[in-house]
Amino acid sequence: MTRACAPYLKKSGNGRVVNISAFIGLSAEGSSIAHATAKAALIHLNRCLAVALAPDVTVNSVAPGLMDGTTMFNRISADNTEAAKQRAVLKRHSSLSDVADQVLTFCRADTVTGQVLVIDGGIVFH
C-alpha cells in the first residue's frame, strides 16, 4: 500500500504514513511467535520507510497493547484481561480513541518520523 501511494505522498511534500503495529513487536512475550515476529518486522519497515521517503513523507507507528472493545480483548478471559490491567502502571487498558488520538498527532507532526509509540497503559517501556 505504501509503495503504491509513495509517489503521491512525496508529490504532496507533506505526506504521512502511520502504521498500526502492536506492543508484542517490541517484547519477547506472548504465545504467538508468528504474530510477534510480523509486528517486529512492521516496526523495522517503519524505520526503513522513514529514511527512504524523507524528506517529503513522515512514517511513524502506533503499537497498541490490549484495547477495550476489540475482538482480541473479547477473546481473552476476564481473569487475563484483569491481570494485564494490573500489570500496567496506569492500571487501565488502552482504548480505540487512545490509538486514534495518537494517529492524529503523528499526522499533525512535521518533524517526527521513524518513531514507534507504545500505547498500553505502561506495560512495555520503549
Regions picked out by a protein language model, each given a short descriptive name:
Residues 27-33, 91:
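Active-site loop immediately N-terminal to the catalytic Tyr-X3-Lys motif
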